[in-house]
């Protein structure tokens, strides 16, 4: 029986890794061994940061809403408590955008909640 060297698959596998590491710096893009390790680590960071991004954006929205509310004499926790009681169904992302881009509408919402 003939010996199978598997050369085509071997080259294709290496090519696939090196193609994914195209924008990396130095030997991390051309040396297969380093490229493979760097790519694996990069994928780990990507997975971790997809989870972290959600937390970061939520924190950003809360900070923006809180900053807009301090000028109006109400704090964040009281605002959200009143928001839920008055049955206004706006999420933090929408409220954050309103606080930055359309301050008049945001003020109307705060006024509605205060009364």
UniProtKB/Swiss-Prot annotation:
One GO molecular function term? structural constituent of ribosome
Keyword check for RNA-binding, yes or no: yes
| TM segment ranges | none
- Renumbered to this chain, the signal peptide range is none
User: Matching CDD domains, A to Z?
Assistant: Ribosomal_L20 (cd07026)
Q: Which domain of life is it from?
A: Bacteria
Pfam families documented for this protein: Ribosomal_L20
Q: Its GO CC terms?
A: ribonucleoprotein complex; ribosome
Keyword set, alphabetical order: Ribonucleoprotein, Ribosomal protein, RNA-binding, rRNA-binding
- Tell me the GO BP annotations in alphabetical order: ribosomal large subunit assembly; translation
What's its job?
Binds directly to 23S ribosomal RNA and is necessary for the in vitro assembly process of the 50S ribosomal subunit. It is not involved in the protein synthesizing functions of that subunit.
The UniProt similarity line reads: Belongs to the bacterial ribosomal protein bL20 family.
Identify the PANTHER family for this entry.
39S RIBOSOMAL PROTEIN L20
Name-wise, this protein is: Large ribosomal subunit protein bL20
- Organism of origin is Borrelia turicatae (strain 91E135)
């Amino acid at each position: 029986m003939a010996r199978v060297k598997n050369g085509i698959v071997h080259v294709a596998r290496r090519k696939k890794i090196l193609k994914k590491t195209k924008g990396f710096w130095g030997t991390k893009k051309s040396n297969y061994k380093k490229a493979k390790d760097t790519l694996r680590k990069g994928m780990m960071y990507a997975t971790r940061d997809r989870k972290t991004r959600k937390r970061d954006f939520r924190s950003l929205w809360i900070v923006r809403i809180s900053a807009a509310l301090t000028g109006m004499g109400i704090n964040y926790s009281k605002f959200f408590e009143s928001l839920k009681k008055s049955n206004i169904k706006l999420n933090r992302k929408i409220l954050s955008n309103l606080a930055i881009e359309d301050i008049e509408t945001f003020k109307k919402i705060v006024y509605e909640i205060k009364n």
